[in-house]
Amino acid sequence: MNRSLYRTRIKFCGMTRAGDIRLAGELGVDAVGFIFAHGSPRRVAPAEARAMRQATAPMVDVVALFRNNSKEEVREVVRTVRPTLLQFHGEEDDAFCRSFNLPYLKAVPMGSSGVNGEDANARTLQLSYPNTAGFLFDSHAPGAGGGTGKTFDWSRLPTGLHRPFLLAGGINADNVFDAIVATLPWGVDVSSGVELAPGIKDGHKMRKFVEEVRRADCHDMS
């Protein structure tokens, strides 16, 4: 397949500064993510995210990330921030995830413990989350948070998925080209790979990351 006919979507997650969000829009990033998971160093309050949301460019999705938050907390974020997409990293089931009447992504932990001790299985995932807009495969272990800066073995990705998937976990400008060529994801999700410190993005790393994604898109796979 000629990658010039395909565009990998890009999501920058863990945003905490309006200036970083504006730069993401200028770079053509498809989505920015705010983290509301307890214990995350990138966690922001709903009011902070609402203020930063004003910096998003037109046609850029605003993603709200949760990990075992209560239904009331998710509802407050939906009401206050007005995200266009939800992302769940905990033990939330499909009924919970779809109860907010917004499209959602379900994160799948691919850390050393795998998914319940086993590799992810496409059929099981799709039966468990029939209403998800897509899956996100990250390197964290079950019950842990993302943004670890660690990769996982990409050969363990399940085959036969009928939903789009995003690749996350330790992706940066140095390896995103190889990651895309190896796995052909719908999109890539990066946080620590474009940071100086948790939540503090680096403009040079952001630009370089986008350049490498576009280079991969132009790579001839034939």
Curated annotation (Swiss-Prot):
The keyword Repressor does not apply. InterPro entries: Aldolase_TIM, PRAI_dom, RibuloseP-bd_barrel, TrpF_fam. Pathway: Amino-acid biosynthesis; L-tryptophan biosynthesis; L-tryptophan from chorismate: step 3/5. GO terms for molecular function: phosphoribosylanthranilate isomerase activity. It catalyses: N-(5-phospho-beta-D-ribosyl)anthranilate = 1-(2-carboxyphenylamino)-1-deoxy-D-ribulose 5-phosphate. Keywords: Amino-acid biosynthesis, Aromatic amino acid biosynthesis, Isomerase, Tryptophan biosynthesis. It holds the Pfam family PRAI. Disulfide bonds: none annotated. This is N-(5'-phosphoribosyl)anthranilate isomerase. It comes from Xanthomonas euvesicatoria pv. vesicatoria (strain 85-10).
